[in-house]
């Protein structure tokens, strides 16, 4: 191993090249060589490819194009069937031995063209639309990749313990902050650093232009790491040693100047769900096409759509798991098309066929083959389940295990290399499966007698390979490639650089990696933002509806406001809320955070700078916010009776608009700086509360500066305070308010008007009028001289927020670089398991234990597992279905998704459900499992000839395609939860737990049974999904939807083999499967094959080696080629319009008229007749749920408590908010005195608790929504637990944290403010605080229980906040309410009663002492004292207040309140309200809880809509009309 880094002696001799390519010539297809003006007759040898007629002569582009029509079929044959290189005698001889297969596949290739609507990929590529070509027709961008001695370093990620609530709380006091700081300033990191290990070890090789390399290895072996390294995506690695070059360009130069030319297509499909397929592709091309070439964009889009068979989805939303859009397979094709739209020269594809059926996967691979050949691209692919047809399309293969290179070389030599080492390849195994199995100690097989001598570990296999001739050939090729570059003076590379430079816009620097200028990037992102707005019309309309509603509500509350002094304070309130309500919505945070992964990928593709997105959102904000502000300001301004002077209105409009823009920018800044959406909501919510508190409305400016010694400075950094001063001074400037009669002091008989004062701050002695400017100066210290200064300050804040956002978008990256290691719960057993599982092999999600194919260890323990299998609950009942049809509403009509499907499931029978993407496989499973929630299902589904009973769903297991679990539970906890709640209620609990032990043992999950499910890899989660269903002992049938999707071939085989054992033990199984290998399909007994539209084209036995299926199609003139995968043959045959006697075969009709179908129908009828005669055993009472409701509730409550404990962000967020708001509230109003302003501050201090719900509800709603979604999707359909248990558990789990949060908030707020310390008052307020925290939790839950979607909830929440904030008698006194609101809204507002109760408890004990400026000043008539003149007024007319200086003869001062009781009466709070309000508020809390139960049952279980469908029906008609108008415009634009 010491010589690993030494290059073996490389020869420049042509013969040393393992591919027989002359060193000085290009490695190209013979077919393509005809298009080069520099080719010789050696390029078109005896194999007779392109240019045969002109052999020996240079072929011109014109001549080649004249021959193109005749030649393109030959190119297709060359491209698709691996007889590519005329110079490769070994490959040619191999192809010549397969004449029959080639003939058949040529016929299928021609049918492929018909299937794609006549689209010819070769012709399209040769046309030069997707990339530039030379005058000779050659691709202008040709770049090969060479890598020498590459070692990739990664941080060691061992198994760890789950982070719990105490860990999060302790982390707040330093450790978490320290980690964040060290992330950006590594020099501050002290102590032991995490160890660094090799992810890849000493890789060398070359992939030349026009070549395809298949990278094979099990998940975690290093395949994704290798692809990312080649794609120059190194951010997630600790370091990369060695050299990677791209046509002679260094990795550094490539990343800096040509980043978009080398791309990595990740496994997951991340797109903006509200964009259509056409918009997604157009956006990609806009950013990769300069203005001069923009006419080619529609042509390329059309070609890409045809290429991948998704033309019909052109105007369909891409969608995701929450937004309905294209299917999963179609979404994968969109991802592929988007990557091709980058026009890159080197592309690395990471498991891009996941979710595609075998036929589509093969079509995709063929398309890559053609593009690689014709465009001379360099292509690297990793596939987990590669069929032989796909493997034969590859030039090279690289086998990786544990980060080590086991083989690299020609694909057609790999199998023999390992056979020569002593490995055995089973006859039915594909080459890719065989090569992958070498990495699995439990799956690989050795030749008899060579078990000991054959190398086994990754290190041994690597060492053997590096001593082999194949490794020397690698170095020969690397040296030959480098010599070629040197001899040609890097001609191709220089042409590549020149072509890339020419493809850029004129305004873009030639050294920039981007194609278009920042202006065009922003313009494209602006267009996309408008598309996103229009694509989510429900949210858009909901938002504007709420805005208009809030405007009407606010203005109606202040409608008819008096112009005299009595309306001064309320007018200030109206202005305050008018600048506040538009910024209450935190909906901007979600898209800003959730789209990060997409933006990061687009940055790697060199589409645009991340800052372009931030700038584009600002640009879109201008019209979007304008459209929000216009209706709102018009409604509020004129309905509240503000000054109708034009200049004042437009100034008001300007500040509302600017403020909304500013705070929206603030939200985006927090989103850009926050790692998660939870953090963004938390910090933005806290910031909003601080802005409201320190705006100068709750506490006047001077009070903040002088009295709030800790936080008063926040007034100066608060943009809302400047806006509030501006709109307030704008309204009150030049306004003179006459004193309201009720505010004249004194009043009554004998009072001389000349000796009266006005009870409003700012009034002057002896004057009955009050100047608005003086009122503002005295009350708020506001002046209109600051108007335009304030405008400039708000603009400055906006610019600051935008700058921080733009910089953060460019600098910060919160996108993870791969999966993590296993995470365990804290226990003694898991401590040992953690130590065993601390090592991994890749920066990807590693296979820690329970590795792929671990189930293959069944041979070692076959006896014990066989006995355990026999103990599984087997049934002799038979499930039959006949003429099943399923129809759903579609547009103005209906669409049939299943059409007359027949079949049966017997014990011991394993049925494969197959079909192309969108054929209806999952639909059929859901229909048979009685899980459809909409549409009409017809047909007969019977068990033993009898109708399905209430226990049917409980007697079946259903494994979803998506592994839906509580991600915070451990494997054992999930299985025990399923077993206890789903097995028969009469089974002892210990017996159920013992059964779980058997399942864990059978599934080989012992070593990771205490691992958190959220940390598992794909294959482990799939086994847990199966285990959860097996733990329920399904007595009838086990449904599985794509159990092998996303798994490598060995993991897929292990899963299916385990299912086979279950089937042999008596379990009936119906399983959908996408890409079964030959070995995989042989595990099934029967196959039910569907075509699109839910039409059956075959149902029957597979037969040994697929003979029964092959015979069925052979009888109809379609012969399966020898060694062809039967599953692939079925799908490909059904997908293509195969010719028979000059006509196209309708396979659906063929099946309906076949003898096999008649036999199946007869058998179903026979089963029904025979089984229906068997008497039904008396089972007693049939229960919908196996476990009693009490057991369901207790177990679910325990699980939810564990979930909140192990996912601390939820509980921690509540504690964090309580602490922060409590501190700000308590210490801002620190130890209030007894003045009137302090009484007002007491009132607002109590009132400020309503600032907590907007933050808390934004965390309650997502948590409840996620749990509700899991219950609706899996746990309720499986009848694990019912609606009552779900509601009760969610309600109970909120109570402890509500009490703790209330206690923390109360301690930090109540005593610092200086409220009464007697136990009666303090205890009562704590009790009310606890009820309030319980109220807000249940409030959020019932809203979420009722609302149809999370988006609607987010937009509706502000409406509720407005209602409870306004109609409680604080913002506007109850006596001034308009009649419409006065007699109902005030009383149905729960917050009203909370405020009245708390105020009635803490106010009465306060004796008020007026400050001089708070008293009303007036002079008594000459010769009278204040008491003599105004005593009667105070005692009999006013009945409240007192004279500060009764004996004075001038400047009398009247204090309007003598104590807190008199003050609270103005708030409509009475002496006896205390316990009455407690009882009423408690009733509201109970009603909230009742509503949770009510809406979950009625809406989620019963499906009631409460007329919402009719309400929005008219809106839907209007929307459709608008859509038609815009769709016509869109079609014109696309054409």
UniProtKB/Swiss-Prot annotation:
It is a multi-pass membrane protein. One of its GO terms (cellular component) is plasma membrane. Residues 46-76 have a biased composition (Basic and acidic residues). Residues 34-45 have a biased composition (Low complexity). Induction: Expression is highly up-regulated in the presence of miconazole. Expression is controlled by the AP-1-like transcription factor yap1. The promoter contains a putative Yap1 response element YRE (5'-TTAGTAA-3') from -462 to -456 relative to the start codon. Residues 1-115, 834-868 are annotated as: Disordered. The keyword Cell membrane applies. SMART domains: AAA. Residues 79-93 have a biased composition (Basic residues). Its main location: membrane. InterPro entries: AAA+_ATPase (IPR003593), ABC2_TM (IPR013525), ABC_trans_N (IPR029481), ABC_transporter-like_ATP-bd (IPR003439), ABC_transporter-like_CS (IPR017871), ABCG_PDR_1 (IPR034001), ABCG_PDR_2 (IPR034003), P-loop_NTPase (IPR027417). It holds the Pfam family ABC2_membrane. Keywords: ATP-binding, Cell membrane, Glycoprotein, Membrane, Nucleotide-binding, Repeat, Transmembrane, Transmembrane helix, Transport. It is found in: Cell membrane. Disruption phenotype: Leads to voriconazole sensitivity of the yap1-mutated voriconazole-resistant strain. Glycans are attached at residues 33, 149, 274, 287, 351, 892, 1459. One of its GO terms (molecular function) is ATP binding. It catalyses: voriconazole(in) + ATP + H2O = voriconazole(out) + ADP + phosphate + H(+). It comes from the Eukaryota. The keyword Transmembrane applies. PANTHER family: ATP-BINDING CASSETTE TRANSPORTER (PTHR19241). Pleiotropic ABC efflux transporter involved in the basal level of azole susceptibility. Confers resistance to voriconazole. This is ABC multidrug transporter atrF. It comes from Aspergillus flavus (strain ATCC 200026 / FGSC A1120 / IAM 13836 / NRRL 3357 / JCM 12722 / SRRC 167). The lineage of its organism: Eukaryota, Fungi, Dikarya, Ascomycota, Pezizomycotina.
């Amino acid at each position: 191993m010491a010589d690993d880094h030494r290059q073996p002696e490389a020869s420049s001799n042509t013969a040393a090249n393992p591919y027989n390519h002359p060193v000085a010539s290009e490695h190209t297809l013979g077919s393509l060589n005809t298009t080069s003006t520099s080719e010789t007759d050696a390029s078109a040898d005896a194999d007779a490819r392109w240019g045969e007629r002109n052999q020996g002569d240079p072929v011109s582009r014109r001549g080649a194009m004249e021959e193109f029509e005749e030649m393109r079929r030959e190119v297709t044959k060359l491209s698709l069937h691996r007889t590519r290189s005329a110079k490769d005698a070994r490959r040619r001889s191999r192809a010549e031995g397969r004449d029959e297969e080639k003939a058949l596949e040529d016929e299928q290739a021609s049918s492929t063209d018909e299937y794609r609507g006549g689209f010819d990929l070769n012709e399209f590529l040769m046309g030069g639309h997707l990339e530039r070509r030379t005058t000779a027709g050659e691709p202008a961008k040709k770049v090969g990749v060479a890598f020498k001695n590459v070692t990739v370093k990664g941080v060691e990620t061992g198994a760890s313990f789950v982070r719990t609530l105490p860990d999060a709380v302790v982390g707040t006091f330093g450790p978490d902050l320290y980690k964040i700081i060290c992330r950006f300033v590594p020099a501050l990191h002290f102590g032991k650093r995490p160890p660094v290990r090799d992810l890849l070890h000493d890789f060398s090789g070359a992939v030349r232009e026009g070549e395809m390399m298949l990278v094979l290895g099990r998940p975690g072996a290093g395949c994704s790491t290798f692809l990312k390294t080649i794609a120059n995506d190194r951010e997630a690695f600790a370091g990369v040693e060695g050299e990677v070059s791209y046509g002679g360009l260094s990795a550094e130069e490539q990343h800096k100047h040509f980043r978009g030319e080398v791309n990595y297509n990740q496994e997951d499909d991340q797109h903006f769900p509200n964009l259509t397929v056409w918009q997604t592709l157009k956006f990609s091309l806009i950013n990769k096409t300069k203005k001069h070439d923009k006419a080619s964009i529609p042509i390329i889009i059309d070609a890409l759509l045809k290429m991948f068979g998704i033309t019909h989805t052109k105007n369909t939303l891409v969608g995701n798991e929450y937004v309905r859009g294209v299917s999963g397979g179609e979404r994968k094709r969109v991802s592929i098309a988007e990557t091709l739209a980058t026009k890159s020269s080197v592309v690395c594809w990471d498991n891009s066929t996941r979710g595609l059926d075998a036929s589509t996967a093969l079509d995709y691979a063929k398309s890559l083959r053609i593009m690689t050949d014709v465009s001379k691209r360099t292509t690297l692919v990793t596939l987990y389940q590669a069929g032989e047809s796909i493997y034969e399309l590859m030039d090279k293969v690289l086998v990786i295990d544990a980060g080590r290179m086991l083989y690299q070389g020609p694909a057609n030599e790999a199998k023999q290399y390992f056979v020569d080492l002593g490995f055995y390849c089973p006859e039915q195994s594909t080459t890719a499966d065989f090569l992958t199995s070498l990495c699995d100690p439990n799956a690989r097989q050795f030749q008899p007698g060579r078990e000991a001598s054959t190398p086994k570990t990754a290190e041994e296999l690597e060492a053997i390979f590096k001593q082999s001739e194949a490794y020397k050939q690698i170095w020969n090729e690397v040296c030959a490639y480098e010599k070629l570059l040197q001899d040609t003076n890097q001609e191709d590379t220089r042409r590549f650089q020149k072509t890339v430079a020419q493809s850029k816009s004129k305004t873009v620097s030639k050294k920039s990696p981007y194609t278009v200028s920042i202006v065009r990037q922003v313009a494209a992102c602006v267009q996309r933002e408008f598309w996103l707005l229009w694509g989510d019309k429900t949210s858009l309309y909901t938002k504007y509806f709420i805005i208009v509603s809030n405007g009407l509500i606010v203005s109606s509350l202040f409608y008819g406001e008096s112009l005299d002094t009595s309306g001064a304070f309320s007018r200030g309130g109206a202005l305050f809320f008018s600048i506040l309500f538009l910024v209450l919505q935190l909906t901007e945070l979600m898209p800003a955070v959730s789209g990060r992964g997409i933006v990061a990928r687009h940055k790697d593709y060199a589409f645009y700078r991340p800052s372009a997105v931030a700038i584009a959102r600002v640009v879109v904000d201008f019209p979007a916010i304008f459209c929000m502000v216009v209706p709102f300001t018009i409604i509020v301004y004129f309905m509240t009776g503000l000054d109708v002077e034009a200049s004042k209105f437009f100034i008001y409009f300007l500040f509302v608009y600017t403020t909304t823009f500013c705070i929206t920018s603030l939200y985006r800044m927090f989103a850009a700086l926050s790692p998660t959406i939870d953090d963004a909501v938390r910090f933005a919510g806290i910031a909003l509360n601080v802005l409201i508190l320190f705006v100068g409305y709750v506490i006047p400016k001077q009070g903040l500066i002088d009295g709030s010694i800790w936080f008063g400075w926040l007034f100066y950094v608060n943009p809302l305070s400047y806006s509030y001063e501006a709109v307030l001074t704008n309204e009150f400037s030049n306004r003179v308010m006459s004193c309201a009669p009720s505010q004249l002091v004194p009043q009554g008989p004998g009072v001389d008007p000349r000796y009266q004062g006005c009870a409003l701050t700012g009034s002057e002695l002896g004057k009955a009028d009050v100047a608005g400017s003086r009122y503002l100066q005295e009350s708020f210290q506001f002046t209109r001289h600051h108007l335009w200064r304030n405008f400039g300050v708000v603009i400055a804040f906006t610019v600051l927020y935008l700058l921080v956002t733009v910089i953060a978008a460019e600098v910060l990256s919160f996108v993870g670089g791969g999966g993590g290691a296993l995470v365990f719960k804290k226990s003694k057993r898991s401590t040992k398991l953690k130590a065993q599982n601390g090592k991994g092999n890749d920066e990807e999600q590693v296979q820690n234990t329970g590795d792929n194919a671990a189930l293959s260890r069944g041979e070692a323990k076959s006896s014990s597992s066989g006995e355990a299998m026999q103990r599984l609950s087997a049934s002799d009942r038979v499930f039959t279905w006949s003429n099943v049809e399923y129809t759903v509403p579609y547009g103005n009509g209906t669409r049939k998704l299943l059409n007359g499907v027949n079949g049966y499931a017997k014990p011991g029978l394993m049925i494969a459900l197959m079909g192309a993407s969108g054929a209806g496989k999952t639909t059929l499973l859901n229909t048979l499992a009685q899980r459809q929630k909409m549409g009409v299902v017809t047909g007969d589904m019977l068990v033993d000839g009898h109708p399905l009973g209430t226990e049917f769903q409980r007697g079946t297991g259903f494994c979803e395609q998506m592994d839906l679990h509580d991600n915070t539970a451990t494997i054992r906890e999930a299985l025990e939860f399923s077993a206890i709640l789903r097995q028969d209620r009469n089974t002892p609990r210990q017996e159920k737990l013992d059964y779980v032990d058997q399942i864990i043992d059978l599934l080989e999950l012992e070593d990771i049974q205490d691992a958190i499910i959220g940390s598992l890899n794909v294959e482990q989660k799939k086994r847990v999904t199966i285990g959860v269903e097996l733990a329920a002992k399904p007595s009838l049938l086990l449904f599985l939807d794509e159990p092998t999707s996303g798994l490598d071939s060995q993991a897929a085989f292990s899963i299916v083999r385990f299912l086979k054992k279950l089937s042999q033990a008596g379990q009936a199984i119906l399983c959908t499967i996408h890409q079964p290998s030959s070995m995989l399909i042989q595990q099934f007994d029967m196959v039910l094959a569907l075509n699109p539209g839910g039409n059956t084209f075959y149902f029957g036995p597979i037969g040994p080696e697929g003979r029964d299926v092959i015979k069925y199609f052979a009888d109809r003139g379609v012969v399966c080629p020898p060694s062809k995968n039967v599953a692939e043959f079925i799908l490909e045959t059904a997908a293509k319009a195969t010719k028979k006697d000059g006509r196209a075969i309708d396979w659906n009709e063929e099946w309906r008229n076949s003898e096999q179908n008649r036999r199946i129908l007869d058998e179903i009828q026979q089963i029904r007749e025979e089984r229906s005669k068997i008497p039904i055993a008396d089972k007693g009472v049939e229960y919908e749920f196996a476990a009693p409701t009490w057991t369901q509730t207790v177990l679910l409550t325990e699980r939810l408590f564990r979930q909140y404990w192990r996912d601390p962000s939820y509980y921690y967020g509540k504690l964090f908010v309580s602490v922060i708001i409590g501190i700000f509230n308590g210490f801002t109003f620190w130890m209030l005195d007894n003045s009137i302003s302090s009484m007002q501050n007491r009132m607002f201090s109590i009132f400020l608790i309503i600032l907590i719900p907007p933050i808390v509800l934004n965390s309650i709603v997502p948590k409840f929504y996620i749990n509700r979604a899991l219950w609706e999707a899996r746990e309720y359909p499986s009848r694990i637990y019912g609606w009552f248990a779900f509601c009760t558990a969610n309600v109970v789990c909120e109570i402890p944290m509500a009490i703790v949060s209330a206690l923390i908030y109360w301690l930090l707020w109540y005593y610092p403010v200086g409220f009464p310390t007697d136990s009666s008052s303090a205890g009562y307020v704590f009790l009310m605080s606890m009820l309030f925290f319980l109220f807000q939790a249940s409030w959020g839950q019932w809203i979420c229980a009722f609302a149809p979607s999370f988006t609607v909830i987010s937009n509706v929440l502000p409406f509720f906040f407005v209602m409870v904030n306004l109609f409680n008698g604080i913002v506007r006194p109850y006596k001034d309410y308009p009649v419409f609101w006065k007699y109902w809204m005030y009383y149905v507002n729960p917050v009203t009663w909370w405020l009245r109760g708390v105020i009635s408890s803490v106010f009465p004990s306060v004796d008020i002492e007026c400050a001089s400026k708070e008293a009303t000043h007036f002079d008594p008539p000459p010769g009278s004292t204040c008491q003599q003149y105004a005593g009667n007024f105070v005692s009999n007319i006013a009945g409240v207040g007192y004279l500060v200086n009764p004996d004075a003869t001038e400047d009398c001062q009247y204090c309007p309140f003598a104590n807190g009781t008199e003050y609270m009466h103005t708030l409509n709070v009475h002496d006896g309200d205390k316990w009455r309000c407690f009882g009423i508020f408690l009733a509201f809390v109970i009603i909230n809880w009742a509503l949770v139960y009510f809406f979950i049952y009625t809406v989620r279980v019963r499906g009631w809509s409460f007329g919402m469908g009719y309400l929005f029906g008219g809106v839907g008609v209007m929307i459709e009309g608008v859509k038609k108008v815009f769709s016509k415009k869109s079609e014109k634009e696309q054409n």
